């Protein structure tokens, strides 16, 4: 058995031809979890050989538009194809706050198209199967596959002014994957990452660019994202074997700029494996690269 972790999008709100909006696909056998759905997620899933009807659930970390702009496309396309596959509504896992109303609104946006399709092909309007949970201050179970092999925990992360923001910990028979969502470096993600095999974490070069962004709106934006140097320190303290960087601020467009991300993480003291993410990068568990028997779950 293997579990794969595929980055369906590593970008930010600014559009990029190379990077779709944020998203991660975690797959174990026939269980497929999509975490977030930024712009072009549906197309990246198609490139990865994944159809919307195959998704076991969509997990939302928070409702910033760059993370949810393709939710409508996923839900609607799954509905359009349902007469072929019969898999029913898309399960959506999210905090029970603004998410239910958000999902309801996007499902009604294409009202004319829905009316036409219901008259001719579909059995009824598009729906989702909501799995809403209260914002948890400690890692809390929020979803489990029907086969019982894949379990998901969530915890609140620090992305204020966004209050309803969480990270996820996905456990399969092959190992543990953590997806931070958008957050500062924080104790909550550190706790979520203990004994994880792979941590997919957002990354912002705040320290390196501090003078450049001073007294600009970016100074505020950077304050609620994860500084790469601080992230390296946190990952080393927790003993993360493999750190995968995504939601890259700013977008690296050359090998030298990719190397700068790696250097920042090393400057923070991290000695494990680093992958600076790009769209459709895939990590397989059990890992093909042994991070060393002393790293996993080490508290320093």
Predicted region positions:
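Binuclear metal-dependent hydrolase catalytic cores
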Residues: 1-177, 257-290, 296-299
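Active-site donor-binding acidic/aromatic loop of nucleotide-activated sugar
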Residues: 180
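Cap/insert and terminal regions of metallo-dependent hydrolase folds
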Residues: 167, 174-176, 184-278
């Amino acid at each position: 058995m293997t579990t794969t972790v595929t980055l369906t999008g590593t970008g930010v709100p600014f559009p990029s031809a190379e990077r779709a909006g944020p998203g991660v696909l975690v797959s174990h056998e026939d269980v497929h979890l999509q975490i977030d759905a930024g712009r072009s997620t549906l197309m990246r899933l198609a490139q990865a050989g994944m159809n919307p009807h195959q998704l076991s659930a969509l997990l939302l970390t928070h409702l910033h538009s760059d993370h949810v702009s393709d939710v409508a496309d996923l839900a609607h396309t799954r509905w359009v194809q349902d007469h072929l596959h019969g898999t029913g509504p898309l399960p959506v896992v999210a905090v029970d706050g603004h998410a239910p109303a958000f999902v309801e609104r996007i499902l009604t946006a294409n009202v004319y198209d829905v009316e036409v399709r219901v008259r001719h092909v579909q059995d009824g309007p598009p729906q989702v199967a909501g799995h809403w949970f209260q914002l948890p201050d400690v890692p809390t179970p929020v979803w489990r596959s029907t086969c019982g092999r894949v379990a998901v925990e969530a915890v609140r992360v620090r992305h204020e002014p966004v209050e309803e923001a969480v990270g996820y910990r996905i456990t399969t028979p092959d190992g543990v994957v953590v997806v931070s969502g958008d957050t500062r470096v924080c104790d909550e993600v550190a706790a979520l990452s203990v004994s994880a095999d792979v941590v997919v974490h957002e990354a912002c070069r705040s320290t390196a660019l501090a003078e450049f962004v001073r007294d600009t709106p970016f100074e505020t934006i950077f304050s609620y994202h994860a500084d790469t140097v601080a992230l390296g320190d946190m990952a080393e303290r927790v003993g993360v074997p493999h750190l995968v960087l995504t939601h890259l601020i700013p977008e690296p467009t050359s090998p030298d700029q990719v190397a700068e991300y790696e250097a920042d993480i090393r400057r923070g003291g991290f000695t494990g494996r680093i992958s600076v993410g790009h769209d459709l990068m895939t990590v397989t568990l059990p890992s093909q690269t042994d991070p060393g028997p002393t790293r996993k779950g080490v508290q320093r």
